[in-house]
């Protein structure tokens, strides 16, 4: 029947040993190679400590002083100080709103007695009485009029030994400096027509942002920095502020050295790294109040971004190292909330991000030196994860944060089904941040780090920007590509596809009709018919079968049969040479050995349930290695697998070995087996449940463990497709004959098909429960 596929795999999986040996010998072969040192070799010299080379810094430093600029009328930007630096007496600056205020600032040299001077202010000649009694300080006088034809009046003064003056538009006021240095302060005048206020300076000036007002005050009181007082500083026209900035080519390829065949290229690149964490959350069995594990998993992310007008396709893999294991135990009762282990990354942990993109820099990244990178920091904050309890309020794990600081960059390799990709591995060290993480409704609080429950905090990805640079030895002909050396790496892409395949397989369980399942289970499915649902199977059947056998050889089922075969060989060697060993089923001494081990366990283990669990673990091996006419659990398992393969769109040649191996181990975990002795039936399940009953009346009787062990040794083991509870329920509600009972006990497929065709709800429900257990 359908379980023939498993028997074929068990019989043929050992035939690939020679192929494995040849492959291992080939991969472990050593080869002597003579290298002719070229112009890039450092032969005959001590080891060289390579420096990082040229790494462009993209940090923008905003200067405090913007200037100096040549005198010219312009619209002073709001929120910026104009710092004037006149060199001779006279009108320094004029400012007006053309409606209610005209301001003209005059500079008077030291030691001037009261006298009348003529100044040109706003295009008109005006006579003003001025004086400066100080012998050391220069005097700025603010002359203001409030009408076009009005007279000027003195409003304020600034005595300065630095000969500097400041003016700013902000908050509908015109601010200036008054008082005496080194204690000059600002003062503001309301302006009626604020938007149209114009300023005309008559000396060189600087522009300082209001955010740097403290620096401006420092200059007014104590003078400009020495660098501004040299003849090398030349004022420029204020129109230069309107020149549009030109983008610098930050991403560049530099030829360091070149010969006829090889050249050294330095690649400087901007980079945007996006990554995310993944996790695995596993619940324990039982009533649903306990969790077994919450751990980090490697996560892949693919994205596009623009670099100098070019769209770059990038791929990252994020993994963690140095995790910290925490646990919580709310009590010993089955209904007490508990987490056996949950992982947290803290200061002693590291985060690795492997980055690759499709740009020219990564095309020949094989022989690399002078690798360096500068990256920004990124903060990762945890989100909420609710532990869904069957009853009561749910505990919630929330909070936790860490900051990732760059700690270095190395080369790494990402391996896919089609190509090996040399990539950059960015290493980040961690620092814990606020907030701490807690588990509500428990004593767990104020712990620091990032737990694995929800490390992405609702974000699709985290992003880091920066630059990297390295020098690569590449072929001089750009059309050539350096071959990438073979490397053994984790196949993250296949694992991602398997996860998608598992999810699709589990969703397909609801689409399998029970009648179709029985039909498939009755077919003699071999390896080729199992593969018939895969595209291009005929061309690749041989290699696919070899891959399936190689993978299946390491499964738990194959290992168990291998151990059993060894024990049978030992038992057979102890039998007289004249005895003919025809099959596993006829070698009674080997199974007697199992019986003896089971009887020894009777005295050691306290409960019959534990004894049944121990012996039932071998019942599948007893059944699978002997031919029986009835349907067994492996027939159903193989039939479900075949039905899902035919419907799946994710399965392919590479995923099939993992699928079949995982199905052999995980499909139908809760199995029950029975042995029949006349009118008595003994039934034992992998969950520790056991029954003994009369076939005629389905009346229970005491379970004799020793007799059960003897029957296992000498009698056929049958899969309890229709277990005792279902059988009794069927008899109580519908009534069955003695012959029907025997046929159901033997798992006769024709009788099962008859009940299903009659749409019997009890039998259909039992088969559907078995189908739902076929999950990856």
Curated annotation (Swiss-Prot):
CC terms in the record's Gene Ontology section: host cell endoplasmic reticulum-Golgi intermediate compartment; host cell plasma membrane; host cell rough endoplasmic reticulum; host cytoskeleton; membrane; viral outer capsid
Span(s) of short sequence motif KID motif: 644-646
Region (Spike head): 65-224
Xref: InterPro entries: ConA-like_dom_sf (IPR013320), Rota_A_VP4 (IPR042546), Rota_VP4_MID (IPR035330), Rota_VP4_MID_sf (IPR038017), VP4_concanavalin-like (IPR000416), VP4_helical (IPR035329)
Keyword Secreted attributed: no
Span(s) of short sequence motif DGE motif: 308-310
Keywords from the UniProt entry: Capsid protein, Coiled coil, Disulfide bond, Hemagglutinin, Host cell membrane, Host cytoplasm, Host cytoskeleton, Host endoplasmic reticulum, Host membrane, Host-virus interaction, Membrane, Outer capsid protein, Viral attachment to host cell, Viral penetration into host cytoplasm, Viral penetration via permeabilization of host membrane, Virion, Virus entry into host cell
UniProt entry tagged with the keyword Disulfide bond: yes
Region (Spike body and stalk (antigen domain)): 248-479
Pfam families linked to this entry: Rota_VP4_MID, VP4_haemagglut, VP4_helical
Location of the motif YGL motif: 448-450
Entry's family note: Belongs to the rotavirus VP4 family.
Protein name: Outer capsid protein VP4
Organism from which the protein derives: Rotavirus A (strain RVA/Cow/United Kingdom/UK/1975/G6P7[5])
